């Protein structure tokens, strides 16, 4: 039987290390943590210098254990799609099963857990990670992806509803005449029309459009891309924050198939790409995500623009 590589994905304080230990206890898998390696070579797991050296050591140990037939757990935040794909390419020469577990915890629970941790990560750092969050998908090269909901369903519901209420704010940006919640509701209606024309799922396309900007209240700043004060509001990272919250909402209590939850999160995190990439990069990106997801992303992009 092939060894199993399990990569954990999640922000600080989400419970990744606990999940890693639970898996290791059942399977005997070897855990490799970037925090542990930093503590080993620098004497401080918070030390962020020379991350390349930390990664090289971790990769070397992961490859060694997989070649020796051991199951391996890679415990780090692993929030970035490009870096995850790069890691999978680095172990492509080893015949193993590639699994990914996304650990999702409400920010409220994370804040409470931080109070009990010996090693505390500031919530400002957690917020930055939420904005950087990119949900894994099978186009990255995984054999299996699981969502590990680390908060209770009732806490997920409360956290989602709290953020939804926060969306009743003006955009304060010339691209939008509607409030954030008004824009999303309008986009949801537009998405139904575009999905009907494309002969594809109405319910899920409407749902994604209805929450695609839900991260905006937590990301609103009056600072431009260059860090200069701005009279208009900007929303850096709202797509990542929103993607994360789509998975908070899509907990087991809501009975939404996991594969659909993953695709929905990816649509939210990628809905700004056509503004952020040059034509060549955008073409490569569209090829990466594949025709089915691109079809749904196009519907979301059109609905988003039509609801401005």
For every predicted segment, state its role.
Residues 18-70:
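Conserved substrate/cofactor phosphate-moiety recognition/catalytic segment
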Residues 160-188, 221-232:
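Active-site flanking loop/helix segments enriched in acidic
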Residues 94-113:
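Conserved phosphate-donor/acceptor-positioning beta-strand/loop module used by diverse small-molecule
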Residues 9, 108-159:
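Conserved GTP-binding G-domain of TRAFAC-class P-loop NTPases and closely related GTPase folds
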């Amino acid at each position: 039987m092939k060894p199993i590589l399990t990569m954990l994905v999640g922000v600080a304080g989400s419970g990744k290390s606990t999940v890693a230990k639970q898996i290791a206890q059942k399977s005997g898998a070897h855990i490799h943590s970037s925090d542990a390696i930093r503590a080993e070579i620098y004497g401080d797991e918070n030390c962020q210098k020379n991350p390349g050296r930390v990664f090289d050591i971790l990769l070397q140990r992961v490859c060694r254990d997989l070649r020796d037939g051991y199951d391996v757990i890679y415990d780090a935040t692993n929030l970035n799609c490009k870096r995850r794909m790069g890691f999978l390419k680095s172990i492509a020469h080893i015949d193993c099963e590639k699994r990914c577990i996304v650990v999702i915890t409400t920010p409220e629970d994370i804040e409470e857990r931080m109070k009990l941790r010996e090693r505390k990560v500031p919530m400002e750092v957690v917020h930055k990670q939420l904005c950087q969050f990119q949900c894994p998908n099978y186009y990255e090269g995984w054999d299996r992806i699981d969502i590990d909901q680390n908060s209770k369903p009732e806490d997920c519901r409360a956290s989602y509803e709290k953020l939804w209420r926060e969306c009743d704010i003006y955009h304060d940006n010339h691209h939008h005449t509607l409030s954030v919640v008004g824009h999303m509701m309008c986009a949801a209606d537009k998405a139904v029309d575009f999905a009907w024309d494309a002969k594809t799922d109405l319910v899920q396309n409407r749902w994604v459009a209805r929450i695609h900007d839900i991260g905006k209240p937590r990301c609103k700043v009056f600072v431009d891309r260059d860090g200069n004060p701005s009279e208009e509001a900007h929303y850096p990272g709202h797509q990542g924050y929103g993607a994360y919250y789509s998975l908070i909402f899509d907990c087991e209590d809501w009975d939404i198939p996991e594969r659909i939850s993953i695709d929905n999160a990816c649509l939210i995190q990628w809905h700004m790409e056509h503004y952020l990439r040059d034509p060549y990069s955008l073409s490569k990106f569209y090829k990466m995500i594949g025709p089915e997801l691109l079809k749904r992303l196009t519907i979301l992009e059109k609905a988003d623009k039509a609801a401005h």
